[in-house]
Regions:
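Conserved residues at the C-terminal ends of beta-strands
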Residues: 73, 183, 216, 359, ...
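Phosphate-binding loop of NTP-binding sites
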Residues: 19-25, 42, 55-65, 74, ...
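ATP-dependent carboxylate-amine ligase
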Residues: 1-48, 65-70, 88-91, 204, ...
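Short loop/edge segments at beta-strand edges and connector loops
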Residues: 50-52, 95-97, 142-144, 216-217, ...
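Acidic, glycine-rich loop-and-beta core segments that form the ion-binding/anion-interacting portion
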Residues: 252
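Short, ordered loop/turn segments at secondary-structure junctions
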Residues: 32, 53, 98-99, 218, ...
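Helix N-cap/beta->alpha junction signal
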Residues: 97, 217-218, 301, 415
Length: 428
């Protein structure tokens, strides 16, 4: 099958491109800018173009190698030139979920899906790490770069697909997993789900499509009660003591451990609990999830109040362990529309930190009628506004951060926008 993937270098589409390539399909693609997966795509010698997505490149590829399937992100609407060109060429068109489900069926894989508002990437990465350490034959796709493996892999003969299942745009409803892990459920993505009830209903439907379920301790456990008759093997679990920083990361680890135990049992293999614990305690982490960039300097993808709270707990633990003076946070909110929803939730989540540098919101898919909230709007609403200043990505901020590091603070960026590449360019 010949596949053309739009948005190929991002963390959503890039792993799919790598997986399909490994599975023997010819993969081409395009992207407006180079993304986090670009290096991995080049290492596999995939053919793709970076720049304006006019549709001309798609047509050129199609003329040489007839494309069977055009796959696009949510950012590519029906009016987009490349989408229009795919339509005019008579190509099959879909988002990634339909292609992934087709590949799962074609290659006879049992999907182990990780879903939830937070913790998906870390939990999936832990599953990948454990599967490699324990010699499990498992393919995978994860929405991040990994520092111990590619972001996706398929090997012929693999029995399982470890997959980070995204609820955005209801993508995960295309799947019927053998096993689903539900990390945490808290209302998000109001541009897709009009109400919290609608968001919950999507998760409930996803759970009903799963053969087996494992819930994290904070994943709205009433779902398990609702599904108990249909799924008598629903597993409710609690955290165990692990040698990993941060309660949230330890909870993610317990889910990954329980999933690996279930996989091993299904294969008739012995479950060596000590071996599993030893392996998970060696987990090296994930790109953009409390990622260490330099001594005392970290970057994290957190941009939801619950994620921020969890990441602060990790940072405070790490600062204490490494004898830092305290924690300094550089925060860039993501999407103005979401900030209107989260505004009141920020009030008390920054307790325990020493300094907070608040950046303007990274704008994406916005409602033009909504007022753009400023850093000052947020800071004035905090319980502890004295810790914060309104800042921007400039040399003044760089000087502040450099001084904080020199003064032995732990500095962490929390952002899903353009602050991460800025930080790397300045410090690395």
């Amino acid at each position: 099958m010949n596949i053309f993937i739009s948005g190929i270098s991002g963390t959503g589409m890039g792993p799919l491109a790598l997986f399909a390539h490994d599975a023997g399909h010819q993969v081409f693609g395009s992207d407006l800018h180079e993304g986090p997966i670009t290096k991995e795509l080049k290492a596999k010698n995939l053919t793709f173009a970076i720049g304006p997505q006019t549709g001309n490149y798609l047509a050129e590829i199609h003329q040489k190698t007839p494309i069977d399937w055009y796959v696009h992100t949510s950012a590519i609407t029906e009016s987009h030139p490349e989408y229009q060109r795919a339509k005019s060429l008579g190509l099959k068109i879909s988002k990634r979920d339909e292609l992934i489900e087709t590949l799962v069926e074609k290659h006879h894989l049992k999907m182990v899906a990780v879903a939830g508002t937070h913790g998906k990437t870390t939990t999936t990465s832990m599953l990948i790490w454990l599967s490699q350490k324990l010699g499990l034959k498992a393919s995978y796709m994860v929405g991040s770069t990994l520092n111990f493996a590619p972001s996706a892999k398929y090997d012929q003969g693999d029995q399982f697909l470890l997959y980070e299942a995204d609820e955005y745009d209801r993508n995960f409803l295309a799947f019927h997993p053998w096993l689903s892990l539900i990390t945490f459920v808290s209302y998000d993505h109001s541009d897709i789900f009009a109400t919290a009830a609608e968001y919950q209903e999507a998760f409930l439907k996803f759970e009903s499509q799963s053969e087996h379920l494992i819930f994290g301790p904070h994943a709205n456990l009433h779902h398990a009660e609702l599904l108990a008759d249909k799924h008598p093997d629903v597993l409710l679990m609690s955290a165990k003591e692990l040698m990993l920083p941060g309660e949230a990361r330890r909870l993610d680890a317990t889910l990954a451990i329980k999933a690996v135990q279930r996989i091993l049992e299904s294969l008739g293999r012995e479950v060596n609990h000590e071996e599993i614990i030893e392996a998970i305690n060696q987990f090296p982490g994930v790109g953009r999830r409390f990622e260490r960039l330099a001594d005392g300097l970290y970057s994290d993808y957190a941009h939801h109040p619950e994620e921020i709270r969890a990441t602060i707990n990790v940072a405070l633990e790490e600062a204490k362990r490494t004898q830092k003076k305290g924690v300094v946070i550089l925060y860039q909110p993501h999407q103005n529309i979401r900030q209107h929803e989260f505004f009141d939730e920020y009030r008390d989540i920054f307790h325990g930190i020493k300094k907070l540098y608040w950046l303007p919101t990274y704008l994406s898919r916005e409602d033009p009628k909504l007022k753009i909230l400023t850093p000052s709007d947020f800071l004035s609403s905090l319980d502890n506004p004295e810790i914060g200043t309104a800042d921007k990505l400039d040399d003044t901020l760089f000087a502040k951060l450099r001084q904080d590091l020199a003064d032995n603070y732990l500095v962490i960026l929390m952002s899903a926008g353009d602050a991460d590449p800025w930080l790397r360019q300045k410090f690395l």
